């Protein structure tokens, strides 16, 4: 694990994988996940020529909490990290609930971000019909996200279950997943990464989880304002964030390309890891 002491005194935890001198890509992990989320076979990342940097958001893993954080005030943390690593331009990748953070970085650092890749993304929740494009659990957050005491109670419950028995927690998470995801995580190496990532997410309790919910109430920008090229990958069988959500997000982004993986689920990022990473080597300046 690597850490950076930010200007305001907080700690930012990150990891680096892949090719040391490869194309830098900063990954935004999903909701209830951590910097440990990546394909466990590092050879694939090396072969793709990618220097992958994964980061714990505030309250997750080893990164200090940041009460009241938003998508936009996450950007200075990433900017400081890129400066520390002496990275001028870079790509941004995300999975699931990491997508608003990826787009926020593209919005605020448009002169430094050359490409954005979103996999199984969540779109804005404050639009008509949003609840029709996601699992009922996200519908709950959409409906009650403004009730902070209720969300804190829900977050503490999530953290307690994850910290008491991570294998059981992962089983329950996957129970309602489509068959492609269940098959994917039958691979024990992937399953261990999955469990390790979620266990790390709740290391400090529910701070990260709760912070993500509160941040999602208001993005602070619109997809129409993103001028960076965006590639979206989504599985047709995703039952957490439906493919229609990714398609609608692509329609709102000025320079987006949407690719559907037929017969794949929410975690198609791991099955198609190499292809997704290769997106960053296309049309490099």
Annotate the PLM regions:
Residues 10-62:
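Conserved HGGG/HGGXW glycine-rich cap/lid loop of the alpha/beta-hydrolase fold
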Residues 137-221:
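Alpha/beta-hydrolase
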Residues 255-285:
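Catalytic active-site module of serine/aspartate enzymes centered on a nucleophile-bearing elbow/loop
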Residues 239-245:
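Conserved alpha/beta-hydrolase "acid-adjacent" motif
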Residues 57-73:
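Cap/lid segment of the alpha/beta-hydrolase catalytic domain
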Residues 226, 232-234, 238:
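Short beta-strand/loop motif that positions the catalytic acidic residue
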Residues 89-133:
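Conserved hydrolase catalytic core segment
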Residues 73-91:
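Conserved acidic catalytic loop of the alpha/beta-hydrolase fold
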């Amino acid at each position: 694990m690597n850490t950076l002491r930010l200007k305001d005194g907080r700690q930012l935890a990150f990891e680096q994988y892949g090719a040391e001198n490869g194309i830098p890509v900063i990954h935004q992990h999903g909701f209830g996940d951590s910097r440990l989320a990546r394909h466990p076979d590092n050879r694939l990342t090396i072969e793709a020529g990618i220097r992958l940097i994964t980061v714990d958001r505030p309250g997750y893993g080893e990164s200090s909490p940041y009460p009241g954080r938003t998508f936009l005030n996450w950007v200075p943390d990433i900017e400081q990290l890129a400066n520390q690593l002496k990275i001028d331009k870079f790509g941004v990748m995300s999975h699931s609930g990491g997508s608003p953070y990826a787009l926020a970085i593209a919005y605020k650092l448009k002169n430094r971000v050359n490409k954005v890749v979103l996999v199984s993304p969540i779109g804005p929740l404050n639009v008509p019909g949003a609840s029709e494009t996601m699992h009922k659990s996200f519908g709950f957050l959409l409906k009650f996200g403004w009730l902070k005491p209720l969300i804190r109670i829900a977050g503490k419950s999530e953290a307690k279950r994850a910290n008491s028995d991570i294998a059981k927690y992962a089983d329950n998470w996957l129970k309602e997943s489509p068959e492609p995801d269940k098959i994917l995580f039958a691979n024990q190496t992937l399953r261990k990464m999955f469990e390790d990532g979620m266990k790390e997410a709740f290391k400090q309790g529910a701070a990260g989880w709760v912070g993500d919910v509160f941040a999602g109430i208001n993005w602070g920008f619109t997809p129409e304002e993103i001028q960076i090229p965006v590639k979206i990958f989504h599985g047709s069988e995703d039952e957490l964030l439906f493919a229609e959500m990714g398609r609608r997000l692509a329609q709102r982004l000025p320079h987006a390309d949407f690719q559907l993986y037929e017969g794949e689920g929410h975690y198609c990022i791991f099955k198609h890891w190499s292809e997704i990473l290769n997106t960053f080597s296309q049309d490099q300046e």
